[in-house]
Each structure stands twice: as C-alpha cells, then as structure tokens.
C-alpha cells in the first residue's frame, strides 16, 4: 500500500498546466489539432485527469486518442480506494449513529422534553462531525493524494525539465483546485492555470 507522503521532485524543473473542463463529454469534442499543437509546443511529458469517468470510457474519447497518437501517457489521479474506504468507515459509523438517534427522536411524544432536547443537540453535533469529516476527506486528504501521484509520475520521468497538463472537471475544480495548486507550489512545481479569461481559440480544445 502507498503511504501518503509528499516529497519535492529533486533535480528537476517541473511545470504543471491546469485546465478545467465542464465534464467528460467536453473531452469528446476536443479539437485534435489544437490539442496536439499545445502539447507539442509546451513539451508535455504526461497528462493527468480528474474526471468522474471510468478510464476505459475515457480511453475512447477523442482526447485520449490524440494522446495515444502522439505518445503521451495519461493517468487518472485520485485517492486510492483502500484509503478512501478506511477514512470513510468513520463517516459511515457516524451516519449509522445519526440514523438511530433521529429515529428515536422522531418517535418521542414530547420532543420538547429534556430527553428530546438532549437528542436534538446530539443529532446536531453528529451532523456537524459528519460534515467536518467529509470536508477533511474531500478538501484536504484527496488533494494531497492527487498531488502525491503527480509528483511520483514526474519523479519517474527521465527528463530534467518535466511538464504536464492536469485536466479537471469544473465542479471538482471549484472544490479542490486551489488546494492542489497550493500544494504543487509548496513542493516547487510551477503552476500555470488556464481559465475562460484566456484566448479561447488558443487554449481551449
């Protein structure tokens, strides 16, 4: 099993280009020529993706076919299932406790009683704990795993100057892109983000 340990890439200059795409369907409408031109001009060594899509399905997109044609490897970056399962166990336990407490609270004849108020306070507290644990998992732990995988791939590249592109689903980006960028920069990766303010015909594929 992998250990969540982030280390900077030694003796290499690493550049990350980040793009947000609306969804996986946008990858199917990719302009092959524009994508190829961008990847070749920037000397891209590999591509990482963070989309809600099965990689077998992804491999059939126009986007993936372009990468295959020009010999650029692509990787899905995410928290491993075993790590997700381990961390999510605590959340499931809290949710089961919440269900039991809620059922007990609903069954009370006098919800304004001391017992009713105590149950209500407990339910509110459990709800807060669940929300906090979900935020820690999705907004802190997951970005760390994503960056770890990016750094590991960069370390395995033979080149001294390593460039990669990270494509991420827009709604996912809204949640975690700032954390991913911050972590990459913390580990000496130069990050260049592209958004709708840039010239569309030059950078949107």
Question: What function would you assign to each model-found segment?
Answer:
Residues 1-205:
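Compositional signal for N-terminal targeting/processing segments
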């Amino acid at each position: 099993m992998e250990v969540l340990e982030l280390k900077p890439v030694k003796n290499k200059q690493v550049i990350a280009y980040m793009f947000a795409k609306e969804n996986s369907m946008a990858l199917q409408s990719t302009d092959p020529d524009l994508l190829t031109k961008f990847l070749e001009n920037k000397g891209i060594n590999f591509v990482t993706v963070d989309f809600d899509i099965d990689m077998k399905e992804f491999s059939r997109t126009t986007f993936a076919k372009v990468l295959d044609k020009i010999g650029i490897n692509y990787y899905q970056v995410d928290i491993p299932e075993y790590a997700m399962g381990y961390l999510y166990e605590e959340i499931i336990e809290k949710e089961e406790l919440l269900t039991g407490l809620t059922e007990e609270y609903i069954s009370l004849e006098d919800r304004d009683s001391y017992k009713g108020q105590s149950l209500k306070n407990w339910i509110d507290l459990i709800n807060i704990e669940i929300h906090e644990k979900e935020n820690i998992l999705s907004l802190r732990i997951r970005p760390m795993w994503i960056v770890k995988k990016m750094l590991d791939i960069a370390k395995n590249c033979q080149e001294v100057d390593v460039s990669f592109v990270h494509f991420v689903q827009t709604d996912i980006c809204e949640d975690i892109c700032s954390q991913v960028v911050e972590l990459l920069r913390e580990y000496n990766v130069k990050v260049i983000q592209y958004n709708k303010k840039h010239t569309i015909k030059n950078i949107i594929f």
